[in-house]
């Protein structure tokens, strides 16, 4: 959370990401923060708070990182799912992780079984952030978010399951921050 706040404040005018297949063209750190904070508020509005698990099923796209940070930077736990996972693997990961919400790209929505779709509190289409399914249209409350501590779980990454069912690897905020620091120190700066 502190790294997110630092980067989106200090580098607010710099380009965060760029792509060439849409009119938008990319995000600055400031526009990334705006989208991420707005999406986090949507999750909070539907009662998705700190410690709740949020699955992300998508191919690589700019909005993937928006969904990840709207989840992890506010105390929720991100559950990324590989886009080449089968429908059965997607079902197993969502069931095992006890995810309440799923972000899914248009391209991969067919991998979400009717059973899983019915069980989700919230299903959000990742390409546009439109709500595809909500458990109760009238359900709104202030889900409690929190500033995560270094020991809090940030994400659970599931293996590809080449030797059986996928296994979850738990990574804390400290793990992710350590990776960023290592990358920073390994790059030559001029």
Task: Spell out what each predicted region is.
Residues 83-112, 179-190:
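Conserved ATP-dependent adenylate/AMP-binding module captured primarily in the ANL superfamily
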Residues 26-30, 154-181:
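Conserved AMP-binding A3 loop
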Residues 16-47, 52-61, 65-69, 86-91, ...:
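Conserved AMP-binding/adenylate-forming core of the ANL superfamily
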Residues 1-16, 34:
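A short N-terminal helical cap/helix-turn-helix that marks the beginning
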Residues 75:
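Structured binding elements
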Residues 12-15, 139-158, 165, 188-190:
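Conserved pre-ATP/AMP-binding loop-to-beta segment of ANL
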Residues 21, 109-150, 177:
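ANL superfamily adenylate-forming
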Residues 54, 71, 102, 153, ...:
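Conserved S/T- and glycine-rich ATP-binding loop of Class I adenylate-forming
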């Amino acid at each position: 959370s502190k790294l997110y706040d630092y980067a989106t404040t200090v580098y607010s005018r710099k380009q965060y990401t760029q792509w060439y297949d849409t009119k938008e063209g990319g995000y600055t750190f400031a526009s990334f923060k705006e989208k991420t904070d707005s999406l986090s508020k949507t999750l909070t509005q539907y009662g998705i708070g700190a410690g709740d698990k949020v699955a992300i099923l998508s191919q690589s796209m700019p909005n993937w990182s928006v969904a990840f940070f709207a989840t992890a930077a506010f105390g929720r736990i991100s559950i990324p799912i590989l886009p080449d996972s089968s429908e059965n693997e997607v079902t197993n990961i969502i069931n095992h992780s006890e995810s309440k919400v799923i972000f899914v790209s248009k391209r991969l929505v067919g991998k979400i079984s009717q059973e899983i779709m019915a069980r989700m509190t919230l299903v959000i289409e990742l390409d546009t952030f439109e709500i595809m399914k909500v458990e109760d249209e009238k359900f709104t409350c202030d889900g409690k978010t929190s500033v995560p501590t270094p020991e809090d779980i940030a994400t659970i990454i599931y293996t590809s399951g080449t030797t059986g069912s996928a296994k979850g690897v738990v990574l804390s905020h400290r793990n992710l921050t350590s990776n960023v620091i290592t990358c920073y120190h390994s790059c030559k700066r001029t």
